[in-house]
């Protein structure tokens, strides 16, 4: 029996549903989600394997006009996948008209010379007539291999999109073991789950100014719990105060919510200890970016 495999990048502007789509395909949380733009900062690999095929999805940071060194890293990280994949899923929202950000991405895709499938997400939010207008508009911008409307949140048409990808795959190797779902280490996934709760519970400038560093992660042989010590990094003292909250209430809530998700992922009881530290302007300092996991060599 022949086996098919290939690498597929998921590209698009911030907040179009790329991570929601990946998590739905994988059947579990691989990439964190929030309603904040630029939630995904690193390339996230999701490995979808059946008896007949393996699709290695690469969820990328939302492409935007960068204002910091972190933003530069995110955009470069997204575009670098064009050199690594067999197919690109270019995702746009059905409830927003094509904008400058979409046009910028389209120009890069035209030059990349890789097959592109246009994925119009959030179809549950629009009338069919509006969807048809969106399809016609994008069809006139470039020659897409396919145009597929979906709702990643509700799962509408997602399996059809996966089937289309399989049809376009060529025979190849199984690159990863069947039970492996991502290439990121557990420490990275743990840090992302903590950051997700910060994004969920805070507002304004806080989400963009936060990084999470896992200082230690080890099993206690007596209690059989996994002890995790994590530091939430911010850029200003005022941000530190907001995350800690009145009498530590906000930090406690972040820890409780994150611990539940981490326990589900690891399948073990977890003792999570969180601290908050200030590192001024870390998003514009390359050494800090590397220390906090935004390293071009790795992701």
From Swiss-Prot:
Keywords, alphabetical: Cell membrane, Cytoplasm, GTP-binding, Membrane, Nucleotide-binding, Ribosome biogenesis, RNA-binding, rRNA-binding
Compartment(s) of residence: Cytoplasm; Cell membrane
Gene Ontology terms for molecular function: GDP binding; GTP binding; GTPase activity; ribosomal small subunit binding; small ribosomal subunit rRNA binding
Residues of the Era-type G domain: 4-171
Regulation: GTPase activity is inhibited by GDP but not by UTP, CTP, ATP, GMP or cGMP.
UniProt region (G1), positions on chain: 12-19
InterPro entries on file: G_ERA_dom, GTP-bd, GTPase_Era-like, KH_dom-like_a/b, KH_dom_type_2, KH_sf_prok-type, P-loop_NTPase, Small_GTP-bd
Coiled coil: none
Ranges where the record places region G4: 121-124
GO cellular component terms given for this protein: cytoplasm; cytosol; plasma membrane
Membrane topology summary: Peripheral membrane protein
Span of domain KH type-2: 202-280
Main location class: cytoplasm
Region span, G2: 38-42
Gene3D superfamilies to which the protein is assigned, alphabetical: 3.30.300.20, P-loop containing nucleotide triphosphate hydrolases (3.40.50.300)
BP GO terms, sorted: ribosomal small subunit assembly
Quaternary state and interactors: Monomer.
Role, per record: An essential GTPase that binds both GDP and GTP, with rapid nucleotide exchange. Plays a role in 16S rRNA processing and 30S ribosomal subunit biogenesis and possibly also in cell cycle regulation and energy metabolism. Has GTPase activity, binds both GDP and GTP, does not bind UTP, CTP or ATP.
Name of the protein described by the UniProt record: GTPase Era
Species the sequence originates in: Streptococcus mutans serotype c (strain ATCC 700610 / UA159)
């Amino acid at each position: 029996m022949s086996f098919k495999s290939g690498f597929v990048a998921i590209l698009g502007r911030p907040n179009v549903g790329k991570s929601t789509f990946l998590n739905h395909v994988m059947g579990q949380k691989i990439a964190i989600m929030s309603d904040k733009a630029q939630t995904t900062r690193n390339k996230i690999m999701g490995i979808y394997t059946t008896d007949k095929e393996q699709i290695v999805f690469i969820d990328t940071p939302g492409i935007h006009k960068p204002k910091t060194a972190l933003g530069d890293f995110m955009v470069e990280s997204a575009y670098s996948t064009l050199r690594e994949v067999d197919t690109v899923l270019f995702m746009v929202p059905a409830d927003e008209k094509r904008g400058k950000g979409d046009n910028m991405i389209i120009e890069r895709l035209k030059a990349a010379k890789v097959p592109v499938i246009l994925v119009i997400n959030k179809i549950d939010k629009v009338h069919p007539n509006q969807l048809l207008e969106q399809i016609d508009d994008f069809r006139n911008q470039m020659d897409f291999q396919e145009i597929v409307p979906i709702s990643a949140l509700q799962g509408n048409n997602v399996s059809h999109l996966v089937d289309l990808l399989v049809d376009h795959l060529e025979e190849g190797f199984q690159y990863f073991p069947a039970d492996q779902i991502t290439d990121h280490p557990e420490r990275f996934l743990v840090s992302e789950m903590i950051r997700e709760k910060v994004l969920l519970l805070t507002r304004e400038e806080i989400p963009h100014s936060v990084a999470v560093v896992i200082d230690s992660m080890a099993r206690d042989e007596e209690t059989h719990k996994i002890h995790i010590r994590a530091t939430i990094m911010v850029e200003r003292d005022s941000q530190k105060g907001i995350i800690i909250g009145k009498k530590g209430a906000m930090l406690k809530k972040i820890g409780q919510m994150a611990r539940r998700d981490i326990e589900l992922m690891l399948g073990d009881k977890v003792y999570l200890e969180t601290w908050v530290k200030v590192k001024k302007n870390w998003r514009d300092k390359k050494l800090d970016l590397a220390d906090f996991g935004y390293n071009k060599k790795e992701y």
